Amino acid sequence: MNITIHRGANQIGGCITEISSDNCKLLIDFGSNLPGNQKAELTEKQICDIAGSADAVFYTHYHGDHVGLHHLIPASIKQYIGAGAKDIMLCKYDALNQHGDYGKEIEMV
């Protein structure tokens, strides 16, 4: 078993951790950087390199630095979050939808 911390060890936020074996790759969180963070956001290629072969993504909670890039995970990869956290995310996106369409981003989780 291998554990790789892609982001979050040397910064606050933007957490992405990989747990893998010969036949399985799981990601824990896929967060965006916190505002004001001096680290560059991931490129599309970096996101594909990290998430492309994952079997699933599990989110620890609904804060943006843990789920902020969930909408960039390929649709073929299953994503999981607790029911309470999902309800909070849906409430947030429902409120935001009054000013734009954010629904497609949350449907994947």
Outline where the language-model segments fall.
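Metal-dependent catalytic neighborhoods of phosphoester/phosphodiester hydrolases
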Residues: 68-76
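Pre-active-site segment of Zn-dependent metallo-hydrolases
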Residues: 11-14, 18-59, 71-72, 81-103
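Extreme N-terminal starter segment of soluble prokaryotic enzymes
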Residues: 1-2, 25
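Hydrophobic alpha-helical bundles that form the membrane domains of multi-pass transporters
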Residues: 61-69
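Short Gly/Pro-enriched turn/cap motifs at secondary-structure boundaries
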Residues: 7-9
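Short, intrinsically disordered, charge-balanced linker/junction segments flanking boundaries
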Residues: 103-109
